[in-house]
From Swiss-Prot:
Main location: membrane
Domain of life: Bacteria
Ranges annotated as biased composition (Polar residues): 989-998
Annotated Low complexity bias: 44-61, 1003-1016
UniProt-annotated location(s): Cell membrane
Protein name per its UniProtKB record: UPF0182 protein BL1029
Transmembrane segments: 77-97, 126-146, 179-199, 235-255, 282-302, 326-346, 372-392
Keyword Transmembrane on entry: yes
Region span, Disordered: 12-74, 977-1044
Species of provenance: Bifidobacterium longum (strain NCC 2705)
Pfam short name (any one): UPF0182
């Protein structure tokens, strides 16, 4: 056997000497082959008839004559082993494919199986296509190198006595081709798997849409940057990788085949040679790689329009006048360098034959002078143009005149940002405010005043749980939702929650109970947002089990909730007709009501094959053997609404909040979906996770931010609904002007419903999404200015205030105040509108926190089928005058805390075992200024305690009101009579227990608390009023002492006395 046979281990018998040792006396036959490719035959006769040796070295190939006789093992054993291996492979494949098959069943049941096949087809197609191209490129490169193999090459060298000696067996062309095929396929599969991960960019590139607007630098449609450019860069990167692999394969194969020969010097001599055919091939590969690099450099200039600068996103003066032209110059130099190096390599004859590397140093330097000089020139020029020139231009030309030089590009950034984030139609007005509360100031804003929300959805979840949870296996979200419903012909702000299943609360956990008995939650609970009961509890208009109230009067109402955010376990439901029901429906009597699922909510597990698949998926043999799994059974899983929408529309960014709504007699979960891009030219890049993080997302388990994603274009293009009973998903195109959703509609035809399919009832619950508003709020803190000079100076930049109701540690971390849903009347609206609102204070670290702006967006989509309300999505910004001193939220909270009377009463409230909980601090443009409203809750420290609304704080300017009701507190800051009645006005008692913190106004106002003089009352009526007054005093005393039993008794006595007084006063 020869020395240095690199492929003998893979394709020969000489790789392991132990295989050729004892116990095998077969004769060894030496088979001599010419040039390593075939048997040596003396067929080359010269003109005189004498034979001449074959071309190339005659190398011995060692082969072994097969031994005669039978094999050592039995044929039956081999067959058995083969069968076992085949079965193992089949079982392994079945287990591996079980998840894919069950996913197909899940998507098929929902009607979205095309999502799987489209993704899978594109991914596999890209993988296979790129793998084949990579393998073909590598093989062609190696095959060409093998064909260029020199006749005299024999493959290996060793050193003997200090001299280079040629010995050994050359690698045969056949063996080299085999190796090239194997390695090419391996490389192709590896790189193909990386390429298919970017399936969405490729699909969008081939389904590109026009934005109808062009970038200001190159004049190209913005659709080119959003759709075409990401895919084009991906394709160019793939081509560059192909050419790079081709070059590597060529070099390696030429080295193995002898086209490139190099050894280190020994005794002053060495061997270095590149054959002519090798040089030509390498020269071509080198030029192709340099051309690909040049093209990628040219395409890279478009990235300048989305590069993140120190001040703006997009090309600045230096980028436009230095970076962009230099990039074109460098691309040209790269291409020229590729031509120079390729031609030099193909024509450099000094690289042929043997050369004494150690002795002929000067000749070697001369041979390499052209490439070394060319590369050095390009590197030096590149450093000057790409580094020195932009730095010098920026420092000596731009910086001294920055405002003038950059104004054009800042203006581009302002215009593009406002367009990309939907801020170009912002309505701004100057809001001239007053900080003096005058009597009757709210008389013209009675509807808004009546709708001021008192229930804080972040605080009252424990109250909902305590009063409406019913059983421990139910729960409510820790942050409730705010919606609006028409009750008795009046639109009411509502705090609503679904009663979800919570298996963690069930003490009797086992497979049967977890997966076949406790399968669903039951009903929704809804309370008025603007009022509470006399004892501070939410005033429910939908509650109880079975559910009763204003929302469920329809006979078609379906209260069962099989799909909800808190439902994480799978359930097996359904049974043949006539089978005794075993699903627990709701508690009633001693046993509870039972039911059987009748919908189409999940894949069928009615046959053995599907049972086996799901038993593997969920690792449960109970699915195979339980009698609860029948021919009509369905398996419900992936039951979170957000998860279901994410699976059927993986290209959407989903809002961090999912909320329930009663729509046409069914409970629907509504999910907002966004289309985003990070390639909109000149638009400011935003970290969506940071922009949507606030005190709610930090403290809540059910509301989240958008995550760590950067984008500079966003649209709320999709509204999705998930039916709480059967889990069906419906996707509606909400923003029909968005080019991105148009592209996805082309990619997944038939997946979306159009706007005309939205019913009037569903339309009434479509609201403006929080996450989008928070992103826009973040951008408008700077981009409310429309002048480049004003933006450059930054003197009018704002910021969102931190949440002053949070702990000091949270405030130190700059946890922002969340926006709030409210029905209010702002500038430009004649009637109160359901809105989402927030505030601004000056940017920076100043301790003087004054209000600079009030931001709101119309969130009422109307109630007309297939038509969005005309004002929906209108963003309104009310800017306060520069000399205004209206306190910001933090300063208003400080005013509350610093008020002596407020502090005294709060201290009394939290004495003993009670605790005071501050609710959300609402800001409302009322009475010609800004009114702050904060509900104050009280709860005991017991394990079953829950907050009750006991007081309300109100601030207007520097005036503070603090009373049992919002109505009374408003009167305190508006001269004794605000002129309007709040939603809790009916809770105002004859005995004013609130404090007049302004020292000059009575908390009780004429006409609102007196029903007549005492002399006009009957003795019975007077006694009833006296009983009510005493009951109120008893209530206050019990509350201060933390005696909630006595408090409840006193409240009942108060209610009885008031009812009696009402009857007597008729």
């Amino acid at each position: 056997m020869s020395f240095n046979d690199p492929f003998s281990i893979l394709f020969g018998n000489g790789g392991d000497s132990r295989r050729n040792n004892a116990n095998n006396d077969d004769p060894i036959i030496l088979d001599v082959e010419a040039d390593g490719d075939g048997p040596a035959r003396n067929t080359n006769a010269g003109p005189s008839g004498s034979s001449r040796p074959p071309r190339g070295p005659a190398n011995p190939r060692i082969t072994r004559k097969p031994a005669s006789g039978g094999s050592g093992g039995s044929r039956g054993s081999k067959i058995l082993i083969g069968v076992v291996l085949a079965l193992a492979i089949i079982v392994g494949l079945f287990f591996g494919l079980s998840r894919f098959i069950t996913d197909l069943m899940w998507y098929g049941q929902l009607g979205f199986q095309s999502v799987v096949w489209t993704q899978l087809g594109v991914k596999i197609g890209l993988w296979v296509a790129y793998a084949l191209l990579m393998a073909l490129t590598g093989f062609v490169s190696a095959w060409l190198a093998i064909r260029a193999r020199p006749d005299s090459a024999d493959g290996s060298t060793i050193r003997i006595n200090g001299d280079v000696v040629e010995v050994g067996k050359s690698v045969s062309s056949k063996t080299a081709r085999r190796v090239a095929v194997v390695i090419s396929l391996i490389v192709g599969v590896i790189f193909g798997s990386q390429f298919n991960a970017n399936w969405s960019e490729i699909l969008l590139m081939f389904n590109a849409q026009s934005f109808g607007t062009t970038d200001p630098q190159f004049g190209l449609d913005n659709g080119f940057y959003v759709f075409v450019l990401p895919g084009l860069k991906l394709v160019l990167a793939a081509v560059a990788m192909l050419l790079g692999v081709g070059l590597v394969f060529s070099v390696v194969t030429h080295v193995l085949m002898g086209g490139i020969r190099i050894t280190m010097p020994v005794n002053g001599r060495g061997l270095f040679s590149i054959t002519k055919r090798c040089r030509r091939q390498l020269g071509i590969w080198l030029m192709l790689n340099m051309f690909a690099w040049a093209v990628r450099q040219m395409i890279g200039v478009f990235d300048q329009l989305t590069v993140q600068g120190s001040r703006i996103t997009g090309a600045s003066y230096t980028a436009v006048h230095a970076n962009i032209p230099v990039t074109f110059i460098m691309a040209a130099l790269t291409a020229i360098l590729g031509v120079v190096l390729g031609i030099w390599l193909m024509r450099s004859h000094t690289l042929e034959g043997q050369a004494s590397i150690g002795v002929r140093a000067s000749a070697a330097l001369k041979a390499w002078r052209v490439p070394v000089t060319s590369i050095a020139v390009v590197v030096v020029v590149g450093l000057v143009l790409t580094v020195a020139w932009p730095v010098l231009l920026q420092r000596f030309r731009v910086n001294p005149n920055a405002q003038e030089m950059e104004s054009t590009y800042i203006q581009r950034n302002i215009d593009a940002t406002r367009a990309a984030y939907g801020l170009d139609k912002l309505k701004t007005e100057q809001y001239k405010v007053t900080d003096k509360g005058e009597q009757g100031a709210l008389a013209k804003e009675g509807d808004t005043t009546a709708q001021i929300r008192l229930l804080d959805p972040q605080v009252v979840s424990p109250t909902f749980k305590q009063l409406q949870q019913s059983k421990q296996y139910y729960t409510f979200a820790d942050t409730l939702a705010v919606d609006k419903y028409e009750i008795d012909g009046v639109s009411q702000d509502t705090v609503i929650a679904a009663r979800e299943l919570d298996l963690a609360g069930n003490d009797n956990r086992n497979w049967v109970n977890d997966h076949t008995v406790y399968t669903h939650g039951y009903g929704v609970v809804a309370a008025y947002g603007n009022k509470v009961t006399a004892d501070g509890q939410p005033e429910f208009f939908e509650s109880g089990i079975p559910t009763q109230g204003k929302l469920t009067e329809s006979e078609k109402y379906e209260p069962r909730i099989y799909f909800s955010p808190n439902t994480t376990e799978y359930s097996i439901v359904g049974a043949p007709e006539g089978t005794q029901a075993w699903e627990f429906d709701y508690p009633t009597g001693s046993e509870g009501a039972l039911t059987t699922f009748k919908g189409d909510g999940g894949p069928s597990v009615g046959n053995l094959f599907s049972r086996i698949l799901y038993a593997i998926r969920f690792g449960s043999d109970q699915i195979l053997f339980s009698d609860r799994v029948t021919s009509e059974s369905q398996i419900l899983y992936d039951r979170s609404p957000k998860e279901r929408v994410a699976k059927v529309a993986p290209y959407l960014t989903l809002d961090g909040r999912v909320y329930p709504a009663v729509v046409d007699g069914r409970v629907k979960w509504i999910v907002d979906g966004y289309t985003t891009s990070d390639a909109y030219p000149y638009s400011q890049m935003t970290d969506l996770g940071s922009a949507t993080k606030d005190s709610t997302t930090v403290s809540s388990a059910t509301v989240s931010s958008l995550g760590s994603q950067k984008a500079n274009y966003i649209r709320n293009s999709v509204k999705a609904t998930v039916d709480a009973y059967d889990g069906s998903v419906d996707l509606y195109v909400w923003d029909q002007s968005d080019p991105v959703i148009k592209a996805w509609e082309k990619i997944f035809p038939g997946q979306y419903h159009q706007l005309s399919d939205i019913s009037g009832d569903l339309m009434s619950h479509m609201r403006y999404p929080e996450s989008l508003f928070k992103v826009q709020r973040e951008l408008l803190s700077k981009y409310h200015v429309t002048s480049a000079n004003q933006y450059y100076s930054g003197e009018d930049f704002w910021q969102t205030p931190v949440d002053p109701t949070e702990s000091q540690s949270q405030q130190d971390q700059d946890i922002l105040q969340p926006p709030y849903y409210l029905t209010l009347q702002t500038g430009g609206t004649k009637e109160p509108v359901f809105s989402l609102s927030s505030t601004y204070i000056p940017a920076g670290q100043s301790t003087r926190e004054i209000l600079t702006g009030f931001l709101s967006v119309d969130s009422d989509a109307g109630n007309e089928k297939g038509k969005i309300g005309s004002n929906y999505g209108t963003i309104r910004l009310q800017e306060l005058p520069k000399d205004s001193n209206v306190p910001g939220p933090g300063q208003a909270q400080n005013n509350f805390n610093a008020n002596a009377d407020v502090s005294k009463e709060l201290n009394l409230l939290q004495s003993g075992d009670t605790q005071v909980v501050r609710g959300n601090l609402l800001t409302l443009p009322l009475g010609g200024g800004l009114v702050y409203v904060q509900p104050v809750y009280v709860k005991s420290s017991g394990a079953t305690s829950f907050p009750l609304l006991k007081k309300t704080l109100v601030a207007f300017g520097d005036q503070v009101g603090f009373a049992d009701t919002l109505d009374e507190a408003l009167d305190q800051v508006f001269g004794g009579d605000s002129g309007a009645a709040a939603g809790d006005a009916e809770n105002v008692s004859g005995d004013q227990s609130g404090s007049d913190t302004n020292g000059g106004q009575s908390g009780t106002t004429d006409g609102k608390s007196d029903s007549g003089s005492s002399s006009d009352r009957s003795p019975e009526l007077q006694q009833a009023l006296n009983d009510a007054a005493q009951a109120m005093k008893d209530s206050q005393s019990a509350m201060k002492n933390g005696d909630w039993t006595a408090y409840g008794k006193a409240q009942q006595e108060l209610e009885d006395a008031l009812n009696k007084a009402i009857e007597l006063d008729k």
